[in-house]
Amino acid sequence: VYIDVESREKLLEIEVKGAVPAGKRFDSFVMTCEENGFTSLQRRRGINLIWEGMLPKVDFYPVPSLTLFAHDGRCGYFAHGGKGLESPIYFVSEKLECWYLAENFRTFVQMVVFEPDWKEKITGEKAVFEESHEELADFGMLFGLSSSDEKLSEKIHVESNYKIFENIEKAREKMSLR
């Protein structure tokens, strides 16, 4: 049994034995005027955080539930499994595929900063970045991060535990949604 989180504001009060939350939620950020790591992430890597009061209209419907926190400006969304930014980070592509990206937000940012070609594995498009090691190190310092000894993007894979439907109606056709 799946419970639609989009129509239930107080999901935690719902007690359905064995029910799995489905749908999407949003983690939004407070916009500031100053340049910080997150504005650099947007400018340099095309990762646009979802700002408070500016929630996007998103039609796709994930099962189980995902919490969206950013988009790529091209119909792709970044999300976590609903337990905050310490939980695994996923990417929902415009082809409605769910990709596992990293074990948590910190590791995700580390990968995006130091491996700017990480998205090639998902899109197949060649990324071109001309940043020196010093520029990458400075970028990482905005988040208190340094380069990893392992290639973090090698862990990217299609996540089979999530199904992404075109919309809630398509999900209802295929799943047992309440």
State where each predicted segment sits.
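A surface-exposed partner-binding patch
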Residues: 1-85, 144-178
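Compact, glycine/acidic-enriched structural inserts
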Residues: 89-128
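Generic preference for well-ordered secondary structure
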Residues: 53, 89-96, 136, 152
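Short, flexible coil/linker segments at or flanking structured domains
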Residues: 55-57, 93-96, 131, 156
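An amphipathic alpha-helical core segment
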Residues: 113-155
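Alpha-helix initiation/capping motif
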Residues: 80, 110, 137-138, 164
